[in-house]
Amino acid sequence: MHAIRCLGLVGLLAATAVVQAAPVTYTLDPDHTQVLFSWSHFGYSNPGAYLGLGSGTLVFDEQHPERSSVRVSLPLSELDTHVAALNMHLQQADFLDAAKYPQVTFQSTRVQPLGGNKFKVTGDLTMHGVTRSVALDATLNRVGVHPMSKRQSIGFGATTQIKRSEFGVGAYVPNVGDELTVRITAEGAVAAAAQK
């Protein structure tokens, strides 16, 4: 009987380990996810703009992080420079042409662990109808149960630089900078139903 109990305990622990090792799917939180980008304005200043999250999903495999993935959609209707006239101009046809291309999307194609909490995330960025490969320098901030929501959560940041002209958005280059510096901060959580 003792042997049977031991075997049962071993089986339970093994099953628990499998569950803990399984990839976890997080839904990104629009209230705590921001994409900020800035550029040179004739060399005098470096104004910036904010893009809010439309939708986003992160699948994180803690045991095998190279199997992780992320997908996000950023509606240009959320673009905000804090200058109303500039918001409108950036969405017009000579820039982002938001009426024709209302979304910016990113789909990861590779996650490369660099040691510690650092990762290189490569993926397909689609903007203005053009898709190009982009590499993000990502930092995993924290994984665990959020003290307020009590849900399994994840937080990360990332940076990259892109040339807007490579996406067909080359108006006023080089006076208005071609290179965009992009900074991302994000939080996600497991759906409440998935934790029950």
Language-model segments: residues:
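Hydrophobic helical h-region of N-terminal Sec-dependent signal peptides
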Residues: 9-13
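N-terminal signal peptide c-region/cleavage motif recognized by signal peptidases
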Residues: 15-18
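Low-complexity, acidic/polar, glycine-enriched regions of mature
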Residues: 21-196
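Bacterial N-terminal signal peptides that target proteins for export
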Residues: 1-8
